[in-house]
């Protein structure tokens, strides 16, 4: 399961810093969030899929590390990203 190319392009366009930017932490976090949300839906139906659950936990960990990096380097961008993605309540 992956994020469709069109959806991925929309996410990149929404969160990129400049034209052609696909590697900034904001874009990476947004793409990981989309994949995590898709997998979360998968687990509602396939509760015993432990191999995919390991991949999900790995993605969550990678997103956490990117968010920590962004929080240390650019707190304003971090807060805006959290708000936009709706990650904190």
Curated annotation (Swiss-Prot):
InterPro entries: Ribosomal_uS15, Ribosomal_uS15_bac-type, uS15_NS1_RNA-bd_sf
Alphabetical keyword list: Ribonucleoprotein, Ribosomal protein, RNA-binding, rRNA-binding
Domain of life: Bacteria
GO (cellular component) term, any one: cytosolic small ribosomal subunit
SMART domains assigned to the protein according to its UniProt record, in alphabetical order: Ribosomal_S15 (SM01387)
GO BP, sorted A to Z: translation
Statement: the UniProt record of this protein carries the keyword rRNA-binding: yes
Record's keyword annotation contains rRNA-binding: yes
GO molecular function: rRNA binding; structural constituent of ribosome
The family this protein is said to belong to: Belongs to the universal ribosomal protein uS15 family.
Assembly mode: Part of the 30S ribosomal subunit. Forms a bridge to the 50S subunit in the 70S ribosome, contacting the 23S rRNA.
Function: One of the primary rRNA binding proteins, it binds directly to 16S rRNA where it helps nucleate assembly of the platform of the 30S subunit by binding and bridging several RNA helices of the 16S rRNA.
Name of the protein this chain belongs to: Small ribosomal subunit protein uS15
